Amino acid sequence: MAHYVATVRSPRPREEAFAYLSDLSNFEQWDPGVSSSTQVSGDGPGPGAEYAVRANRADLRYVVEQYRAGHELTFKARTRFFTSLDRVTVVDEGEGSRVVYDAVLTLNGPLGLLDVAIRPMFRRIGDAAAAGLADTLDGELIT
């Protein structure tokens, strides 16, 4: 498995940052690897919402698995080849917020033997997404 964690400090209030990030149709605005993201099931952000996402030439269907309004969401996509599990946590920090983006990419089945080999690529993808996230939230990347 490849694991990536980024933390962004933002002047935006927690509620605002969470509202933006929990709507996965905003993905393409901050992650340069995402070319499109459209909600295909559900009525706005929340548990069970589904999004069709085109990322790094892969068509994904993300499902929001856990949702704690204003604080945390977990969403997952699974293809024949890999499973992507992402968690966004937003907490108050002063007048702004701190956002933690935690992503895990696991190759499925026998491909799992190659997990170590994908870590550098996943780090590059994560670094680009983290930079876009910090920029979009008018924040700074702190880890």
What are these regions (language model features)?
Residues 3-5, 58-62, 82-87:
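Short, surface-exposed coil-to-beta transition loops
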Residues 11-15, 65-70, 89-98:
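A short, structured loop/turn motif at beta-sheet edges
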Residues 49-56, 73-79:
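Short beta-strand segments that buttress and anchor functional surface loops
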